[in-house]
């Protein structure tokens, strides 16, 4: 049971970080290219 909880937390944290970086990068590219 504990192993599943730890794995779920690890995957959730990695997913949040991955999405944060993925969503933060796109807006920066067009902004720089527009200028």
UniProtKB/Swiss-Prot annotation:
BP terms from Gene Ontology: photosynthesis
Annotated SUPFAM superfamilies: Photosystem II reaction center protein T, PsbT
The UniProt entry's coiled-coil ranges are none
Give the subcellular location. Plastid, Chloroplast thylakoid membrane
One GO cellular component assignment for this chain's record is:
photosystem II reaction center
Q: Which InterPro entries does this UniProt record tie to the protein?
A: PSII_PsbT, PSII_PsbT_sf
**What's the main place this protein lives?**
plastid
- Which keywords does this chain's UniProt record carry? Chloroplast, Membrane, Photosynthesis, Photosystem II, Plastid, Thylakoid, Transmembrane, Transmembrane helix
Membrane association type: Single-pass membrane protein
Which protein family is named in the record? Belongs to the PsbT family.
Say what the protein does. Found at the monomer-monomer interface of the photosystem II (PS II) dimer, plays a role in assembly and dimerization of PSII. PSII is a light-driven water plastoquinone oxidoreductase, using light energy to abstract electrons from H(2)O, generating a proton gradient subsequently used for ATP formation.
Subunit: PSII is composed of 1 copy each of membrane proteins PsbA, PsbB, PsbC, PsbD, PsbE, PsbF, PsbH, PsbI, PsbJ, PsbK, PsbL, PsbM, PsbT, PsbY, PsbZ, Psb30/Ycf12, at least 3 peripheral proteins of the oxygen-evolving complex and a large number of cofactors. It forms dimeric complexes.
What is the name of the protein in this document?
Answer: Photosystem II reaction center protein T
Taxonomic classification: Eukaryota, Viridiplantae, Streptophyta, Embryophyta, Tracheophyta
């Amino acid at each position: 049971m504990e192993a599943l909880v730890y794995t779920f937390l690890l995957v959730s944290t990695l997913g949040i970080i991955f999405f944060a970086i993925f969503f933060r990068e796109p807006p920066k590219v067009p902004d720089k290219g527009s200028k």
